């Protein structure tokens, strides 16, 4: 009797799916097939086209809100019609366990000297409350002198100011190394840096506003509450770019630095003047968000280098708004993800499955291919006989030239509501499979692309 839901686990799931549809040259489609996953702990679920696929698909992460029924994007990049009943869509799904890092974007940076000739504001009152390993400072500042900046996005106001806090008799050993903003009285103001020079605490304040949406101007006075703790961060950012690099629990959401209407010829760049320090322990991996019609660089973010991202449209009338999420940075130990400069557009990235074998000259990666396997119409779920759980295999990202062995991956729990004709050719064991293959006409349902708009919120 066919179970109501097929459930199994594996390190890599390869989709080799067919459907009775023709994909026209340049045509872009989204589809679902009822495939779901159980949310993994501390891992990012990735999807990338297999190098054997005739269709193009982006290397991207799967948004947790889509875990119940994963959407897939495909495009015909050839000049000919693609008959999807004969030429399957081939995708690889896998999960990478990222490091559970603590991220600080407001370290207290000690400096030796600062120009104190012109006080940048009027009266500044500060109250200090010390709770052992925490110092809380409540600040009231008036007559702030804002200095206009030239923002990358021309529709925005951008001003900066300094706020000087006299530490009075507060012991310097209570001015801890990690800052946290608990309250700011104006929604468009954020603190980008905290500096300590002798007995002077300097807050670098930024005011940003879109004058097309809100014509309010910068505030002349502010109330600010900050706390300082001795917490040691695994990842320390050189500054807080709150509207562009949004720190999550263990990752950073990267947002567009300007309103972008990319054309299909000229790439558009987003540069971030922030570097990170991890004491040489971690490397960042930027994985683009699925933005229909837009291809984004996938890149390794090396320590002490600014993040630089390029986007290019391959469909007309695309738009990205200022501060709209365009991807996420996850951090991995350097032993797993070596530093590198390799970046490629995510719609051109391809992956392949490999098996590690020993040779006199050391380990060799042999690509797993299915070139002689006929395209099936009957939906089935199967394994590969010689890829038992004790075989050392992995996934290779061809453009990035990064390999992830199963030792550096985490298995996923998959589920699928099968049709009456779906065959499951193995019994789910207690241990996860290395590779499972879901193939045939599994009931693809195409989704209108406007449901996953490039204007979508984070």
Curated annotation (Swiss-Prot):
One Pfam family recorded for the sequence: Herpes_UL82_83
Entry keywords, A to Z: Glycoprotein
InterPro entries hit by this protein: Herpes_UL82/UL83
UniProt keyword annotation of Zinc present: no
Glycosylation-annotated residues: 76, 102, 281, 321, 346, 434, 451
Annotated signal peptide: none
Family per similarity comment: Belongs to the herpesviridae UL82 family.
Record protein name field: Protein U54
Natural source organism: Human herpesvirus 6A (strain Uganda-1102) (HHV-6 variant A)
């Amino acid at each position: 009797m066919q179970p109501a839901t097929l459930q199994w686990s594996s390190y890599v799931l390869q989709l080799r799916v067919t459907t009775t549809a023709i994909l026209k040259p340049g045509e872009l489609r989204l589809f679902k097939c009822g495939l779901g996953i159980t949310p993994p702990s501390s891992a990012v679920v990735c999807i990338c086209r297999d190098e054997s696929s005739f269709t193009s698909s982006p290397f991207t992460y799967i948004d947790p809100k889509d875990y119940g029924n994963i959407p897939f994007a495909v495009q015909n990049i050839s000049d000919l019609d693609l008959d999807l009943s004969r030429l399957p869509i081939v995708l690889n799904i896998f999960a990478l366990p990222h490091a559970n890092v603590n991220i600080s974007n407001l370290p207290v940076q000690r400096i030796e000297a600062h120009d104190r000739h012109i006080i940048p504001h009027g009266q500044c009152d500060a109250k200090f409350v010390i709770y052992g390993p925490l110092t809380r400072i409540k600040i009231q500042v008036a007559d702030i002198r804002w200095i206009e900046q030239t923002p990358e996005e021309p529709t925005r106001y951008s001003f900066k100011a300094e706020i000087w806090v006299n530490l009075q008799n507060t012991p310097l050993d209570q001015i801890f190394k990690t800052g946290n903003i608990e309250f700011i009285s104006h929604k468009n103001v954020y603190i980008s840096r905290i500096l300590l020079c002798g007995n002077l605490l300097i807050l670098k304040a930024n005011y940003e506003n879109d004058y097309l949406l809100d014509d309010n101007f910068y505030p002349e006075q502010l109330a600010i509450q900050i706390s300082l703790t001795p917490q040691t961060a695994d990842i320390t950012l050189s500054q807080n770019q709150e509207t562009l690099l949004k720190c999550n629990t263990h990752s950073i959401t990267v947002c567009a630095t300007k309103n972008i209407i990319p054309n299909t010829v000229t790439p558009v760049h987003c540069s971030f003047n922030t570097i990170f320090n991890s004491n040489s322990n971690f490397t960042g991996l930027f994985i683009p968000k699925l933005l229909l019609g837009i291809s984004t660089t996938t890149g390794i973010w090396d320590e002490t280098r600014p993040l630089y991202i390029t986007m290019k449209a391959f469909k007309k009338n695309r738009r990205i708004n200022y501060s709209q999420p365009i991807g996420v940075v996850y951090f991995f130990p350097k032993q797993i993800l070596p530093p590198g400069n390799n970046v490629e557009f995510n719609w051109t990235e391809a992956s392949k499955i490999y098996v590690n074998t020993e040779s006199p000259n050391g380990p060799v990666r042999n690509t797993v291919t299915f070139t002689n396997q006929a395209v099936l119409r009957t939906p089935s779920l199967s394994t590969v006989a010689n890829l038992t759980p004790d075989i050392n295999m992995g996934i290779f990202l061809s453009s990035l030239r990064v390999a992830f062995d199963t030792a550096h991956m985490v298995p996923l729990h998959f589920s699928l509501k099968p049709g009456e004709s779906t065959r499951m050719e193995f019994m789910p064991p207690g241990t996860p499979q290395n590779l499972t293959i879901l193939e045939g006409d599994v009931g693809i349902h195409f989704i209108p692309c406007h449901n996953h708009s490039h204007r979508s919120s984070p």
